[in-house]
């Protein structure tokens, strides 16, 4: 079993990489929590696939297991759902030394983490991500949140898990769309930090899309190493961590304007990366050759690079509602070189020029 540590001094925690199913997960979790009472939050897609295996491992390790199944999808990530889960936790007798386990993708991790962060001012939290996107991105770093109708992740906190358990064998049960959505975040890491990873994806895309074990294992672990490094250097997104938002400024606007239903998160991020790369080219930060490599990789991966049916002014207004707006200008993470990005304050008129 491989391991990567997110270094946060006394709050450091491990990311475990396992490839043999969930037999060991109960014993691993036992090392990192304070009591045997745990509340597993999962969704309607993941529950029939993995809950019994997780429950069996937890019970063998002496855990008293409660669980709740929420509807799959972004529309479950609401204050109303969080309140329901908080009430279930209270009615079930969860105490301050109890724990919450997120078993699922990014939505489950976000809302379960939000519940863990707020219940009794914070109880132990464990991440078991089951989608590629959650494994490479949302399960690591402690961002937890719910959406409001007008914006994504508006209500949330920084709340680090006690551990993350990643088993890449579960990715074989994902539909192709979910795999591609996760791959968008991996491409992001190549653009913002590690151009060797970008090149690796270009050269091994076929094997990655066929879910070849060696290639999946490499891109998942490398992505986690990059995110762990960034989070260790800037936990609360005061400066460096903002680079992880490449593609997300426009991506979040697209999600909000389409009601979180037309595009899954990774698809919206892919479109966001494409437009933010075009913006970087228009402003002179990258040359046409690099722009084309970014756009071509997004398209070769089967991801969208354009949005449909959204007016320019609506898009601009949604971008301005995002958390990245400062003093009349919009902060974008833009590529400025191979595997390098910078935070750039952009005028509204320059944003309008690049939008459809």
From Swiss-Prot:
Q: Which GO terms describe its cellular component?
A: cytoplasm
Cell compartments where the protein resides: Cytoplasm
User: Membrane-crossing residues?
Assistant: none
Write the protein's name: 3-dehydroquinate synthase
Q: Which residues bind NAD(+)?
A: 106-110, 130-131, 143, 152
One annotated GO molecular function is:
nucleotide binding
Which organism encodes this protein?
A: Caldanaerobacter subterraneus subsp. tengcongensis (strain DSM 15242 / JCM 11007 / NBRC 100824 / MB4)
What positions does the entry give for Zn(2+) binding? 185, 248, 265
Entry keyword set: Amino-acid biosynthesis, Aromatic amino acid biosynthesis, Cobalt, Cytoplasm, Lyase, Metal-binding, NAD, Nucleotide-binding, Zinc
Recorded hits in PANTHER family, A to Z, give: 3-DEHYDROQUINATE SYNTHASE
Q: Does the keyword Disulfide bond apply?
A: no
E.C. number(s) listed in UniProt: 4.2.3.4
Question: What S-S linkages are listed for this chain?
Answer: none
**Enzyme's top EC category:** lyase
